[in-house]
UniProtKB/Swiss-Prot annotation:
GO terms for molecular function: nucleic acid binding. Coiled coil: none annotated. Transmembrane segments: none annotated. This is UPF0102 protein Shewmr7_0260. Belongs to the UPF0102 family.
């Protein structure tokens, strides 16, 4: 299991402990990827997981670029369309730094 997969598993477990329900992992489209798809009450939650072992090059949150946010939004829109979902959604980020988990709800 790669570090990215380990971080996604850790994030998924953490979010499930917080009351979210797991739907799908690593949804890939030619134009973008969604790390985790979760549900929280009536919302579908698209989660980007960022891992950094140390923040010497900036923390996990700083690793998320505007271009990457655009690709995630496009992938989420496509996901909702292909699954015929007309539901509220949000974009969360789970940042894992030095074994600490930071969950940013509605991050972008």
């Amino acid at each position: 299991m790669t570090l990215g997969q380990q971080a996604e598993s850790l994030a998924q477990g953490y979010l499930e402990q917080q009351g979210l329900t797991f739907v799908e992992r690593n949804v890939r489209y030619p134009f973008g990827e969604i790390d985790l798809v979760m549900r929280h009450k009536k919302h579908w939650v698209f989660v980007e997981v960022k891992y950094r072992s140390a923040n010497q090059f900036g923390g996990a949150i700083q690793a998320l670029s505007k271009a990457q946010i655009g690709r995630i939004r496009m992938a989420a829109s496509h996901y909702l369309q292909t699954h015929k979902l007309d539901v509220p959604c949000r974009f969360d980020v789970v940042a894992i730094e030095d074994a600490q988990i930071h969950w940013l709800v509605d991050a972008f």
